[in-house]
Amino acid sequence: MVKTQSSKSTNDMTVGSPLRAIIKFAIPLILGYILQQMYLIIDAAIVGRWIGVGALAAVGASSSIMFLIMGFCNGSCAGFAIPVAQAFGAKDYAKMRAYVSNSIRIAVVFAVVITFLSCIFCGKILHLVNTPKEVFDDAYIFLMLQFAAIPFTIGYNLLSGQIRALGNSKQPFYFLITASVINIILDGILILGMGLGVEGAGIATWLSQGISVLLCIWFIKKKMQILIPKGEERKFDNKKVSILLNNGVPMGLQFSITAIGLIMLQSANNALGMVYVAAFTASMRIKYLFTCVFENIGVAMATYCGQNLGARKLDRIGQGVRASIRMMLVYFVLTFLLIYPFADEMMMLFVDKGEAEVVTYAAQFMRIANYFYPCLGLLTILRYSIQGLGYSNLSMLSGVMEMIARCGVSLWLVPALAWTGVCFGDPVAWVMADLFLIPAFLWLYKHLKKEVL
């Protein structure tokens, strides 16, 4: 028999203080993301300091490609969770489980098709982004191993997204802790102990992601049986599949469209040489560590808005957006106090002091991006709020704005300013996206309030 709601495993975000609900949901997300980025930093440090700058460049040369493909997978799975959150907010649990059942079917198809196509075109994609010849072979091996893990990536993001749709962000955090610790241990064994190099880093990621999927399955079966479909809920439903795809595919495409701009930017940067590729890799690792707070406040807003839309509580949505913006601005001040004086020291985690050029260029990237963090924070809050309200097409258009901006930077700023042009790639993209998202959210919020009234 399927249980109904358990207060210990679910979190109703339609009641109580909006600020408290968002913080309670966001903290495990932020800690989990920081943990994940700390793993990536440790991984990059192991690769850069023990294998060499060339190996670090090999891993970095494929980063935008990974964002293109994994971004589509992760974004689609996040979109599949939106109808689940809305049905949970409306207390329609049978409908919620039917969405779960149909989203699993879609995810299996996505996993097979995306893995197959990614592996076939791996080499051609690396050539397309001007991967330096001296690191091409290592980049190819690393990327192929990442592609082999796509089914695990989709599985984890689908299941953890459904757990979070019910307001539980703690459990996926615990699973990330476990997977990250295993990943770091395997890095030590495979890279330092067995000398497998970049190949060892890829294998470690593959195994740890598989474990995270198994942990999600175990938790749902034991503690969140409210998500397990039964009887008629397991049937294929064309209408629900259509709703899931309408939410998931635009969110996936939003990440992929954004990634196309990143690929253009990285391609322009790769053409500058290996030192700049290594600097880009190091700076992106630290950047993601700091920007994860903005990202996960946004993720919290998607679930918050989804549940409150299902409960038809539009005023709480506006209150939540304002509270999130205040949180974002406070956090920006903290990042500025850390990044501006200590950016150079942070970059020395990845390379020896003798690699002065890499350190200098990477620190410059961090400082320029930091000035524009409020633009990024506003972007994530509004974009995820729009997604939670079920209008993924609008959020996808913001990704188009980012792509246009990064392509423009790649075609004009980088040839004119070289590395400094690369440093302005993200800030210009964030500003362009905000110019679209601010009026889009205001229009959508007024439109939905009229519908509810």
Model-found features: residue ranges?
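Small-residue-rich hydrophobic transmembrane alpha-helices
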Residues: 56-116, 153-172, 279-343, 376-398
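Residue-level signal for short hydrophobic patches within transmembrane helices
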Residues: 15, 19-38, 42, 65-72, ...
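Short runs within selected transmembrane alpha-helices of multi-pass transporters and secretion channels
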Residues: 77, 145-164, 172-180, 201-214, ...
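Interfacial/gating helices of multi-pass transporter permease domains
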Residues: 47-67, 133-138, 198-199, 240-247, ...
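Short alpha-helical transmembrane segments in multi-pass integral membrane proteins
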Residues: 1-26, 84-149, 193-249, 305-372, ...
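Transmembrane helical elements of multi-pass membrane transporters/channels
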Residues: 24-43, 145, 156, 179, ...
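Helix-terminus/linker motif at the lipid-water interface of multi-pass membrane proteins
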Residues: 38-56, 126-133, 189-196, 256-289, ...
